[in-house]
Every structure is written in C-alpha cells, then in structure tokens.
C-alpha cells in the first residue's frame, strides 16, 4: 500500500486527504490540526462503530496499523479522551464501513430532509445527508448487467465472475435450484445467466449473498420496501442496492459525491441506522420518477421487435423464445 485515503469530519466540515502509508500518528495529527485550524493538543481522533479512540500518546506509531484506506476519521475538539491510554483500537475489518456516532434510532425515525442539489455542481448524483456523510446513488450502466455491476464493488468480483459463481452454484445444487425454481433446467439456466444480456434477480441475489456471507438489502424505489437476502451474514456485513423496477444501482456512503474511490459500500449488519436513509434516497428517486411500474410498463424485445406489456409478458416471451434483450418504449 503506497498511501491511505481518509475522510476527515470535523463538526460540519469534511475533507478527503491522502497520506503516505508510512505516515505516523504524529504527522497525521499535525495535518488535522492545520486542516481545521485547531490546537494540536486539543484534538481527539476516533473511528469505527462504536467510536474508538485513535491513541495519540505514541506519535511514532504508523497510522496504517490503526486505520485502513477509505475510512472516515472523526475529529473532536477538547475531548477528554484526547490522550487516552486505553487499549489500542482493534484493526478494522477490511472494507468494512466506518460508522462514527449516529443519533439513537429513536431520533432518526424521520431522517433529515432530503438534500439532492449540490452547491458545487448540478451533475452530482441523487443523495441524502446523514450525520456521517451522504448516502449517494451510484448509477450503473443500463446494459442488462446492472445487478452484477452494482454488486461488483462490495463483493470484489467482476460482473463476469459473479455470473460464473451463480452458474456454478446452480449446477452444483440441483435439488435447491430445480426447474420449478429456475423456470428452466439448471444446465440451461447456467448457460443463460452467463450471457451478458441476461438480467439478474432474486435468484442471483440469494446465491451471491449466501456465497459471500454478506447481507444484501434491495430497496424498492416505488414502495420503499427493503428485501433482505441472507439477513444473518457470516461476515457480519451488509450492502445496499436500489431497485427501480427493471434496474439496479448501488447505494454508497460517499466521502465526496463525485469521487467513488473512497465510497463505503459495506456496513455492519447488526446496525440498522443506515437503512432509513437508503429508504429516503429511494423516496427521493420515486419523486423524480426514477422507477418503472413492472406490471404495466411497455417493453419491446430488441431481438424480434415484439411489443410486450409488463414483466409477466417479458418473462413469458423470454422463456418461449430464449430472447432476453428488452428495452422500454
């Protein structure tokens, strides 16, 4: 690792900083003090959930032994724990979300008002604000692989590799993934899902969440409903995707709206405080008409040109003809 990218949050200010991998706690503290014009000896640094102190007693300790790139660091002033001698914080789970102090659940039953217009650019993605950053929509290309693209970042595999995992699981578990479940023999389904033109859905979500030991929460734009796949994940991690009827996108905790490199996309599955904000994002998208009514939308098979109405017709057409490329019209 050549450097660490960290999001700093102090009161209503935030910044993303890149520091060398061999940077010490002391040099990082100097950077924070200069960035926010704070006296060095009045600063406390915290990360994780529940928030844990970054020990500041030994300024020569490499920062990389305490935090990971992409994490958020809470900067506090005049904190009693500024120079705590408590046990060093435990290293974070790789790729897990940093979730500093959230209000109690009772305080966020009605999350803050939606923010969706950036003061910097009109091209920022839709987002809602939370106490620790913005939950932003990361839009996937509309290319029939949106589900696999949305899951590629949190799961760490390419869309092609995710399709292969699904196909192999289907073939390896014929008793679970029967013709009745798949709508076709497992061999045919495995061949079909390997194609870039084939849409993924609940079967793929079920398989991938179980395979990776991650809870996948799919939030429906039209209804706000949250469908949870693998709600007791082995890794203790959760990711959120947003479903608009025929399309999947990823919801991320964004350090910078226009920079996806430091997005947080894996969260502690035991903590539900993020969920209401993702639902609020879905509500914002609904108000923007960012959804398709799958029962009545008009769709055309782009292979043969047949006009169809609704998901039911599209599914029947795909099963009857093998055509799996559709577009709205």
From Swiss-Prot:
It catalyses: Thiol-dependent hydrolysis of ester, thioester, amide, peptide and isopeptide bonds formed by the C-terminal Gly of ubiquitin (a 76-residue protein attached to proteins as an intracellular targeting signal). GO terms for molecular function: cysteine-type deubiquitinase activity; zinc ion binding. The keyword Nucleus applies. Residues 193-203 are annotated as: Variable-loop. CDD domains: OTU_OTU1 (cd22745), Ubl_OTU1 (cd17059). Residues 243-247 are annotated as: His-loop. The active site is at residues 143, 146, 247, 323. Keywords: Cytoplasm, Hydrolase, Meiosis, Metal-binding, Nucleus, Protease, Thiol protease, Ubl conjugation pathway, Zinc, Zinc-finger. It is found in: Cytoplasm; Nucleus. It is an enzyme of class 3 (hydrolase). Its main location: cytoplasm. The keyword Phosphoprotein does not apply. Residues 135-254 form the OTU domain. Residues 7-89 are annotated as: UBX-like. Residues 140-146 are annotated as: Cys-loop. One of its GO terms (biological process) is meiotic cell cycle. Its EC number is 3.4.19.12. A zinc finger (C2H2-type) spans 299-323. It holds the Pfam family zf-C2H2_OTU1_C. GO terms for cellular component: cytoplasm; cytosol; nucleus. PANTHER family: HIV-INDUCED PROTEIN-7-LIKE PROTEASE, UBIQUITIN THIOESTERASE OTU1. This is Putative ubiquitin thioesterase otu1. The gene is otu1.
């Amino acid at each position: 690792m050549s450097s660490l990218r960290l999001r700093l949050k102090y009161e209503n200010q935030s910044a993303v900083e890149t520091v060398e991998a061999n940077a010490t706690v002391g040099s990082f503290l100097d950077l924070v003090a200069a960035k926010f014009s704070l006296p060095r000896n009045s600063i406390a640094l915290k990360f994780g959930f529940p928030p844990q102190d970054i020990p500041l007693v030994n300024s020569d300790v490499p920062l990389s032994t305490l935090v990971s790139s992409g994490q958020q660091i809470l900067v506090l002033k005049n904190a009693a724990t500024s120079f705590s001698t408590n046990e060093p914080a435990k290293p974070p789970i790789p790729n897990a979300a940093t979730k500093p102090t959230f209000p109690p659940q009772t305080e966020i039953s009605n999350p803050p008002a939606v923010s969706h217009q950036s003061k910097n650019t009109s091209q920022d993605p839709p987002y809602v604000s939370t106490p620790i950053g913005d939950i932003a929509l990361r839009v996937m290309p509309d290319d029939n692989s949106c589900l696999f693209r949305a899951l590629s970042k949190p799961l760490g595999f390419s869309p092609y590799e995710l399709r292969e995992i699904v196909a192999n699981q289907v073939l390896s578990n014929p008793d679970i993934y029967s013709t009745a479940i798949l709508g076709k023999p497992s061999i045919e389904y495995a061949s079909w899902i390997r194609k870039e033109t084939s849409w993924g859905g609940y079967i793929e979500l079920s398989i991938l969440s179980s395979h990776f030991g991650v809870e996948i929460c799919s939030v429906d734009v039209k209804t706000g409903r949250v469908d949870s796949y693998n709600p007791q994940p082995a890794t203790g991690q959760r990711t959120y995707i947003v479903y608009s009827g025929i399309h999947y996108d990823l919801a991320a905790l964004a350090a910078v709206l226009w920079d996806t490199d430091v997005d947080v996309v894996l969260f502690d599955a035991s903590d539900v405080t993020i969920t209401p904000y993702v639902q609020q994002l879905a509500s914002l998208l609904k108000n923007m008409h960012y959804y398709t009514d799958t029962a009545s939308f008009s769709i055309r098979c782009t292979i043969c040109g047949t006009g169809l109405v609704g998901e039911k017709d599209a599914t029947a057409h795909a099963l009857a003809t093998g055509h799996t490329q559709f577009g709205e019209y």
